[in-house]
Amino acid sequence: MACCRCFTDGSTISTGGEDGKLKLWSVDSGFCFVTFSEHTSSITGVAYAPNGKVVLSSSLDGTVRAFDTTRYRNFRTFTSPRPVQFGCISIDASGELIAAGGIDVYEVFLWYVFVLISP
């Protein structure tokens, strides 16, 4: 495991692995209930949108991915204009702005994503 994050209500923990897999775990049962395998390199950061319907992950593969926690699918992939390895990720309190830090270029990349806060 390379990183983890607990959802604010304490019901779910998400983990990012060096194998590129993002897993969601039930705190009550202790079981993994979904595994996303879209990343091709180590996951370096995990963040939840404030509404809890989206979990985001950053990776050394140069992508930031948004996963739907209801339908269990990768519905959006963010990349930079040039290849970069992402080392961390964060989302603001409104759920509209995603920030990811590049570890090889020492830059912060921002995406404005109004669609992530839709009900």
What are these model-derived regions, one by one?
Residues 22-25, 64-68, 107-113:
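WD40-repeat beta-propellers
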Residues 32-38, 74-81, 119:
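Short C-terminal beta-strands that terminate individual repeats in beta-propeller domains
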